Regions:
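Conserved short histidine dyad/triad with adjacent acidic residue
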Residues: 61-79, 118-120
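Glycine- and acidic-residue-biased ligand/ion/polar-headgroup-sensing regions
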Residues: 68-71, 78-100
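Short beta-strand His + acidic residue motifs that chelate non-heme Fe in jelly-roll/DSBH
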Residues: 74-76, 94-95, 117, 122-128
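Short acidic-glycine-tyrosine-enriched beta hairpin
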Residues: 43, 56, 98-120
Length: 156
């Protein structure tokens, strides 16, 4: 029995010490979920955290976008460039075209779904009854142009 207790204590101590390892910051940098710096846009019902690059400037960018639960949706809009999206958590609801009807014209995309928003194509998106966290990769600047009825889309 004493030997068994010793083995259990040794295993617990070994497991605890595994978390004390320090990584070389020249090789690996990480941010724990509780330390992600979200910028909340209450009016839009979402929050964003920049992971890499600067989405307001030309070049590659990576952002996390969190659509907040409560039936928050963007209005129909388009972006100048393609965007590549992975649903990390929750269910993200996506619609295409100028007819804004989140209740009847959106597709639920669960965590693990991969989506491409093609540049200069009208879509809208958001969350219904749960938060949806997305990882978005694109080529900046990441502007969003609202679609207005009768508007002619720019050519690709």
């Amino acid at each position: 029995m004493t030997r068994l207790c010793g083995i259990i204590i040794a295993a617990v101590l070994a497991a605890g010490s595994a978390h004390a390892v320090e990584l070389d910051p020249k090789a690996v940098v990480y941010t724990l979920p509780e330390n992600i710096k979200w910028v909340v846009n209450e009016r839009a019902g979402n929050a964003q955290a920049v992971i890499a690059g600067d989405p307001t400037k030309p070049g590659l960018y990576v952002v996390l976008t969190k659509w907040l639960a409560g039936n928050h949706f963007s209005r129909p809009h388009f972006h100048p460039n393609d965007r590549f999206i992975t649903v990390i958590k929750g269910t993200w609801w996506v619609g295409s075209g100028a007819n804004f009807d989140p209740a009847n014209s959106t597709v639920p995309l669960p965590a693990g779904s991969i989506v491409t928003h093609y540049g200069k194509q009208v879509h809208y998106d958001g969350a219904k009854d749960e938060d949806a966290v997305l990882l978005i990769v694109g080529d900046g600047p990441a502007t969003s142009t609202p679609f207005v009825a009768g508007m002619e889309l720019p050519k690709k």
